[in-house]
């Protein structure tokens, strides 16, 4: 295990080139054996994360919640749900992570709360037109008796985005908006009280030492004036140009938040989850007076094909560079099919939350998917800018496809009546020890989602010290990325390769990624990293190589 290296206060712009590791708390490590990961479990694994070589952690929500959407339905933004631990546990996590030189980013969910949030409970008990209802998007229905929704908006999880409430006398009443599950009512960001609520949330966690926030559904908090009908879509995506996404008013919210963070010093940061295309529009979220990072979902959604990769990299560098920001690269997270599976088939939706399951018409090629995923990760980590890793990808974990219907938890699966599988498959608890109960997730064998037998082979303890393992590949990639300053570097395209090859120089490192089916010539120089064994002077298919040229 690495020695403790207390967090340095510099550089202030650390996020420009950092590699951040996403932890989905309920699936990371379970200290009390109840089948759900928790904060003490995370603390116990901090030495392993530090040993991997990342710079910071992003934690998905651990706040008080009914867990209808795995914590993204928040009932109290300033407390910890008992299933994850206590507020003192969270404070200990922040302190201990800093002792290991790891910064901590936490989620903030500003678009909606839980329907169990005290504000919403008060709104249900109040009358139409009241101060309490004005904090949310309550509206009168259409039709003679108001029995039709106020507009035709659809939930991202399936079904209508409106639910009707019963008034205090039992009569059918107003409708409230929920772009996600009915248990997640949307705030009305035209209300100053909502602004004040989130000022207090940010300062609460900044006072406890967090280093920044990942902002959930950052592009959704402002809705179009008058709530007009949108285009009717069977599966409304998170990033379409509907009247509830990417409205101009969102930027004022984050301009204020930026000022709040800057009052705590120059090294606090905001990262946007904004499913906005083209990237030139996404880049608006990282202008100098707004956020510091925005996940590059255009890159995530790109196939492992040279022409497509060159195009999205060029577009990314131009779009984000145009506002003075590096790109924030990402391939997997808790909302999308893991890229070790996604790259093994042309069928799987790149976006969320469609998912893949046992009744999906095409089954991915697991070996091909892992081979491509290793190559894709090596390509991503060689690019200038910052990058995010999702727990388990450094073990080569695939999407878990064969989860029985009666074990699923995903709201999408139930709202879509099983037509869409959603995100359970990427959220299965990760394996630490091949021969332990629940593969080391805990000591009891309990697991809130079932783990496949294949996880034994992929467990961390099976990969430590194996030079061919995905874990050791990631450790090498992160070590050389840091040593060679690739995150702080710049990209120069290299000529002389076939159309199936992505090749560029970043400083003194040449990066060659063969996305095709045929071997390609390897440049001269010292091989720092290869994602597939090199037997001769050629680079095999679906392989990325880093070569030191000077």
PLM segments and residue spans:
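Active-site and adjacent substrate-binding regions of carbohydrate-active enzymes
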Residues: 1-526, 530-550
